[in-house]
Amino acid sequence: MLDANIKQQLKTYLQMLRHPIELVASLDNSEKARDVEQLVQEIGECSDKVSVRLDGNYDLRPSFSIAKQGEEGRVRFAGLPMGHEFTSLLLGLLHVGGHPPKVEADVIEQIKGLQAPAGGAHFETVISLSCHNCPDVVQAFNTISALNPAFSHTMIDGGMFQPLVEQRKVMAVPTVFQGTQGNSTETFGSGRMTLEEIVAKLDSGAAEKDAAKMNAKGEFDVLIVGGGPAGASAAIYAARKGVATGIVTEKFGGQVLDTLGIENFISVKETEGPKLVAALEQHVKEYDI
């Protein structure tokens, strides 16, 4: 399932685990279940901090959960998290294993303070392994579930669970459903969503907290509305002049985030939207904006 190069990389990453974790697989007699069993067994061979059980009783089969040893699994993959989702699997292993996520400290505190929503605290994300936007959503909900025991999340490979896709009338991926385990049928959202957007939607007091943060800031000489390339460029220009500068935006990067291939950015032969936005954001953070 995993080639020698990936196994070696996995062994290196799993050295970052701070406490033992357990992979619990729920299997059936299908060929895909044998693939899932092989995957979890190979992961278990990469670290003495990873144990494997094959006696899970989760409804969706084949699937497997990642749990801190002695706890119930709150991060689960229904299907094979390969392709674009392999990074989601790797981060899920690390975060459940106690390695801190690369998230702003105030966002982590906000996640830890979330209360279980009235609509249920179990989320299911239907994905496609070829989807470019799906990993961000899967990783966001996995991070929330790893940090806050009130929440749990299952990634569902729509290609492997076609009857579920048809039953829930999934028309696009990623689509996120909310509810309780075994009954997550209410649509929470679809398409690209950032961790911050998801947390804000789950946090009933998010608007008041954001307003308080804004009120605590000083006055701005220049306040730029929009966080796309033009907004980032204008903000850097203003900040370099020594004036107090801020950016107001729903999501940094704007439409560029949803653009996969970019070949008309002068001096750069080819890049991708998320990669360009990450570079823009890092550049903006070099200044007091």
Predicted stretch roles:
Residues 145, 235, 239:
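Gly/Ala-rich phosphate-binding loop of Rossmann-like dinucleotide-binding domains
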Residues 213-230:
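Beta1/beta-strand and adjacent pyrophosphate-binding region of the FAD-binding site
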Residues 240-258:
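Glycine-rich FAD pyrophosphate-binding loop
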Residues 40-69, 150, 154-183, 193-205:
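Thioredoxin-like thiol-disulfide oxidoreductase module
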Residues 36-39, 257-289:
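N-terminal Rossmann-like dinucleotide/flavin-binding domain of flavoprotein oxidoreductases
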Residues 3-41, 113-149, 154:
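Local sequence-structure signature of Cys/Sec-based thiol-disulfide redox active-site neighborhoods
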Residues 23, 123, 222-224, 245:
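Conserved hydrophobic helix-helix packing surfaces used for dimerization/oligomerization
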Residues 68-100, 178-210:
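Non-catalytic, surface beta->alpha helical segment in thiol-disulfide oxidoreductase systems
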